[in-house]
């Protein structure tokens, strides 16, 4: 399966010196580093036993790596974290490229986002197995196998939807179908997830909008939880990132392939509660199709400990690990996400017959988090094209996004929703 370095999810890439300087020069490694720098992903070299600066200078590669960290006395975890810190990146947003079991293990136990094993030498089969067994997410023989996602823009570069997005002409030709995330989009992010509520005016705006066009909520929360918090009838609700949904008529749907993981997730939740319970501020949220571990209230020097525990549980239980705003989550390892859920809802709207015809839907998607990027991709790649809007924040830095427009806060989402409902009312008179 191809592996992708994605600037929406990854802020930096840390390379073992032995992955960069080899007996046989690897042009693909240099090409990869230049691609990463071209999209704003920082690069660093780490080594436990060599003068990396001298080696890079001697090989003419020093200009590719502004950061290099050596440490004869330090463990590899310490070196990796130091390299991430010098690039001003959190380990949970870093890729590590390592060539041996020690490097892979250190990256896994450092809580790094993506751990790539690079096979060097003759015994590729045995080496691959060693790297995989040490915890590598993917093992490659050449870094030319790594895909670099391009074409996204940084959140700060996007125009504000309230100021620049004019929909009047589109509304006469195409009917919107509007998809909303909940936390960070309709609700402010709060220290206690259980206290999250829609911002003032959001529920009323959703009710107005739903009288004029299809509306859907795509949330990572449990389905029953998000329905209770919003409480607007006659709209679509999808919980657990789309693994479970209800239609406006109350019909229940779920991803049957994920049902077998329900007891596995329950077991993982119990294990994580026991393991992480002594860490002040951690919250383990068990959902029907997921386990979310919130660390917003955890001391910064213990966040990596939380991430390591969750990633280890994911590998142990064959579950997918995803991240979000101060949360790391386990879910079924199935090819399903908010983007596929969005397509699934649109297909059902087409089959049901919309007011202006199945070819004329205009999907609009609003979200703030990494998991919403799958829906943004889906909106942009629908046959008719749509409008992805990211709700801006700084918790992931000025990260890249597939969105085309931005809004500054959930209050602005409420205002945008109210304005869209009003425009539709005027158009449909």
UniProtKB/Swiss-Prot annotation:
<comment type="function">
    <text>Removes the phosphate from trehalose 6-phosphate to produce free trehalose.</text>
</comment>
<dbReference type="GO" id="GO:0004805">
    <property type="term" value="F:trehalose-phosphatase activity"/>
</dbReference>
<keyword id="KW-0378">Hydrolase</keyword>
<feature type="binding site">
    <location>
        <position position="181"/>
    </location>
    <ligand>
        <name>Mg(2+)</name>
    </ligand>
</feature>
<dbReference type="InterPro" id="IPR023214">
    <property type="entry name" value="HAD_sf"/>
</dbReference>
<dbReference type="InterPro" id="IPR036412">
    <property type="entry name" value="HAD-like_sf"/>
</dbReference>
<dbReference type="GO" id="GO:0005992">
    <property type="term" value="P:trehalose biosynthetic process"/>
</dbReference>
<keyword id="KW-0460">Magnesium</keyword>
<comment type="similarity">
    <text>Belongs to the trehalose phosphatase family.</text>
</comment>
<feature type="active site" description="Nucleophile">
    <location>
        <position position="181"/>
    </location>
</feature>
<feature type="binding site">
    <location>
        <begin position="181"/>
        <end position="183"/>
    </location>
    <ligand>
        <name>substrate</name>
    </ligand>
</feature>
<keyword id="KW-0479">Metal-binding</keyword>
<dbReference type="InterPro" id="IPR003337">
    <property type="entry name" value="Trehalose_PPase"/>
</dbReference>
<comment type="pathway">
    <text>Glycan biosynthesis; trehalose biosynthesis.</text>
</comment>
<dbReference type="InterPro" id="IPR006379">
    <property type="entry name" value="HAD-SF_hydro_IIB"/>
</dbReference>
<protein>
    <recommendedName>
        <fullName>Trehalose-phosphate phosphatase</fullName>
        <ecNumber>3.1.3.12</ecNumber>
    </recommendedName>
</protein>
<feature type="binding site">
    <location>
        <position position="368"/>
    </location>
    <ligand>
        <name>Mg(2+)</name>
    </ligand>
</feature>
<dbReference type="Pfam" id="PF02358">
    <property type="entry name" value="Trehalose_PPase"/>
</dbReference>
<feature type="binding site">
    <location>
        <position position="183"/>
    </location>
    <ligand>
        <name>Mg(2+)</name>
    </ligand>
</feature>
<dbReference type="GO" id="GO:0046872">
    <property type="term" value="F:metal ion binding"/>
</dbReference>
<dbReference type="InterPro" id="IPR044651">
    <property type="entry name" value="OTSB-like"/>
</dbReference>
